[in-house]
């Protein structure tokens, strides 16, 4: 089980408790602060983080994903990456593509803002476990995550055309 899947399980358990209403409000409010800096969100994330040895940027990624999960009311769709969801939204919209490219270029100071914009833009849920797993590797010098996201985004149209041809055949 990946770190993202473990954290998503944690969030789903929290979502099933009475505390979810307060947690969801705290997570949503936390989007106005740097990830991990809003004290009211800490009681809902720190117990999970205490179980591991996380670097600061990894801690921030957990807080950011929790906030984005709350923003989407826990609408998790396994396998639907943010890149794919943005491609679906971008049909006929150059501005969505520009936002996607800005997201791919986001540094540590910009990532929370860019991700919040992107997640709010798409309709329906995304794979939050995969999002966290990707964020945990986002700042790697090789930029493998950003390259994969670009392939998923720009390759989505090609895969849609292939599916249509298979159905027609």
Swiss-Prot record:
GO terms for biological process: defense response to virus. The keyword Chaperone does not apply. Keywords: Antiviral defense, Plasmid. InterPro entries: CRISPR-assoc_prot_Cse2, Cse2_sf. Homodimer. CRISPR (clustered regularly interspaced short palindromic repeat), is an adaptive immune system that provides protection against mobile genetic elements (viruses, transposable elements and conjugative plasmids). CRISPR clusters contain sequences complementary to antecedent mobile elements and target invading nucleic acids. CRISPR clusters are transcribed and processed into CRISPR RNA (crRNA). Belongs to the CRISPR-associated CasB/Cse2 family. This is CRISPR-associated protein Cse2. It comes from Thermus thermophilus (strain ATCC 27634 / DSM 579 / HB8).
